[in-house]
């Protein structure tokens, strides 16, 4: 008989406050909730919830990803959260609003989008 691998159980941490990092690109939205030291507590993305293709970039997909990450963080006892938003995507506001409706208290919202001081040449303009 094969030896069973002993799987490590998830430890419930008691974390009162943390930081919600929302990375919103043109193709997807990733929400990662960390403690104040930067250790990951919960994460979710539009793609991991089953949204495929162009549906990943919608505000609704960002809302669902944000709610899923918030539920995971609240299982560890999180109550208050600071929000750091990065990127130009369409799911920025929807993700923040979803965090507020799940019951997490949002204390501050910061935009941490990296802005070049005339660095690399940007991609060509889109013609839609």
From Swiss-Prot:
Asked whether the UniProt record includes Transferase among its keywords, one would answer: no
State the PROSITE patterns in the record. Answer: RIBOSOMAL_S11 (PS00054)
**Pfam families, alphabetically?**
Ribosomal_S11 (PF00411)
Q: Which GO terms describe its cellular component?
A: ribonucleoprotein complex; ribosome
GO molecular function, one example? Answer: rRNA binding
The Gene Ontology biological process annotation of the record reads: translation
* Known role: Located on the platform of the 30S subunit, it bridges several disparate RNA helices of the 16S rRNA. Forms part of the Shine-Dalgarno cleft in the 70S ribosome.
NCBIfam families in the cross-refs: PRK05309.1 (NF003698), uS11_bact (TIGR03632)
SUBUNIT field: Part of the 30S ribosomal subunit. Interacts with proteins S7 and S18. Binds to IF-3.
Q: What family, per the record? A: Belongs to the universal ribosomal protein uS11 family.
Q: What is this protein called?
A: Small ribosomal subunit protein uS11
Which organism's genome codes for this protein? Ligilactobacillus salivarius (strain UCC118)
Protein's gene: rpsK
């Amino acid at each position: 008989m094969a030896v069973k691998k002993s799987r490590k159980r998830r430890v419930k941490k008691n974390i009162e406050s943390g930081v919600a990092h929302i990375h919103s690109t043109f193709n997807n939205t990733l929400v990662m909730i960390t403690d104040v030291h930067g250790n990951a507590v919960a994460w979710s993305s539009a793609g991991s919830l089953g949204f495929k293709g162009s549906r990943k970039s919608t505000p609704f997909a960002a809302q669902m990803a944000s709610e899923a990450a918030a539920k995971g963080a609240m299982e560890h006892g999180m109550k208050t959260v600071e929000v750091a938003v990065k990127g130009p995507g369409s799911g920025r506001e929807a993700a923040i609003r979803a965090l507020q409706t799940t019951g997490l208290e949002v204390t501050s919202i910061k935009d941490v989008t990296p802005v070049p001081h005339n660095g690399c040449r940007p991609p060509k303009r889109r013609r839609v």
